[in-house]
């Protein structure tokens, strides 16, 4: 694919590397921590990455957890994926959470803590209407398609709340 998008990037911390892909063709680039921090079990903290970017209108940056860190230590992102809008020009920060119930996680300056994926997006105009067209799904929401025993509302002890 020769249609590469160029994105302006400002290094706010010159000692940290410019975000890079771990392998050619990877969708995400790694983001690094600007500081040392310990995240206690069940706690969260906002961590800087030392970069700011200028995304073009019609694109979005999505900050995802690193799968290896999530699997091995329980480190994730509170609002995964984090959304970076095209108009934002501040430092990219990541709200990390330690999902491990017992062990603290030590982050060191320069550690790769998240991935940034840039995607093109539609910018639709919403039109208010009196009613929506009917579909086979209708208003079926959370759990309505089944596929797991816990979603069976006839099971003993099953609780289905309002608006679910």
UniProtKB/Swiss-Prot annotation:
Keywords, alphabetical: Hydrolase, Magnesium, Metal-binding, Nucleotide metabolism
EC number, UniProt record: 3.6.1.23
Keyword DNA-binding: no
InterPro entries: dUTPase, dUTPase-like, dUTPase-like_sf, dUTPase_trimeric
Signal sequence, start to end: none
Any one of the GO BP annotations: dUTP catabolic process
Cofactors (names): Mg(2+)
Superkingdom of source: Bacteria
Keyword flag Hydrolase: yes
PANTHER family: DEOXYURIDINE 5'-TRIPHOSPHATE NUCLEOTIDOHYDROLASE
Name of the protein in its database record: Deoxyuridine 5'-triphosphate nucleotidohydrolase
Organism lineage: Bacteria, Bacillati, Actinomycetota, Actinomycetes, Mycobacteriales
Annotated gene: dut
